[in-house]
């Protein structure tokens, strides 16, 4: 499972002109699922993400988590995180999970974040989405579990 995590002051997902999810200060998470991933992988990543200290403390050091600041998460499924461009110029996505598995584990990941007390906005799995964000820092971290 792979997550590209961006610290944001706000982020919003829109599908066909309707807002499907948003957050104020917190995290935008682009989530990719691989064939070997499981519900346990999703829960492990959610726990890591909730405790990831990428928010500044009073001294300006990255020492606070999204839980510590009372922030939220906008979670977006993105199979393209497993693109392989090693052969030619057109990406291959054979490293990504099947749509069925991806949908199930995306839902499991979001449920695990909520179980940890985080408010979670969501994109729409498999849809063409417009994502707006204000990256704070910028701070962008990649997590592979």
From Swiss-Prot:
GO CC terms for this protein? Answer: cytoplasm
The answer to whether the entry has keyword RNA-binding is yes
Main location as per UniProt? cytoplasm
Gene3D superfamilies according to UniProt: D-tyrosyl-tRNA(Tyr) deacylase
Q: Which UniProt keywords apply?
A: Cytoplasm, Hydrolase, RNA-binding, tRNA-binding
Residue ranges the record marks as coiled coil = none
EC number annotated for this UniProt entry: 3.1.1.96
Entry's localization field: Cytoplasm
The keyword Ligase belongs to this UniProt entry's keyword annotation? no
An individual GO BP term: tRNA metabolic process
One GO MF term attached to the UniProt entry:
Gly-tRNA(Ala) deacylase activity
InterPro entries tied to this protein: Daa-tRNA_deacyls_DTD (IPR003732), DTD-like_sf (IPR023509)
Q: Where is this motif: Gly-cisPro motif, important for rejection of L-amino acids?
A: 137-138
Similarity-based family: Belongs to the DTD family.
| UniProt protein name | D-aminoacyl-tRNA deacylase
């Amino acid at each position: 499972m792979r997550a590209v995590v961006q610290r944001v002051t706000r982020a919003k997902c829109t599908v066909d002109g309707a807002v499907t999810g948003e957050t104020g200060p917190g995290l935008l998470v682009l989530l990719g699922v691989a064939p070997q991933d499981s519900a346990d992988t999703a829960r492990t990543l959610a726990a890591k993400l909730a405790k990831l200290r990428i928010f500044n403390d009073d001294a300006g050091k990255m020492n606070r988590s999204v839980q510590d600041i009372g922030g939220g998460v906008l979670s977006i499924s993105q199979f393209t995180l497993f693109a392989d461009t090693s052969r030619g110029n057109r990406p291959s996505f054979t490293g990504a999970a099947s749509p069925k598995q991806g949908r199930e584990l995306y839902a499991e990941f979001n449920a695990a974040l909520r179980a940890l007390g985080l408010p979670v906005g969501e994109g729409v799995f498999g849809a063409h989405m417009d994502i707006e964000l204000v990256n704070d820092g910028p701070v962008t971290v990649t997590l592979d579990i």
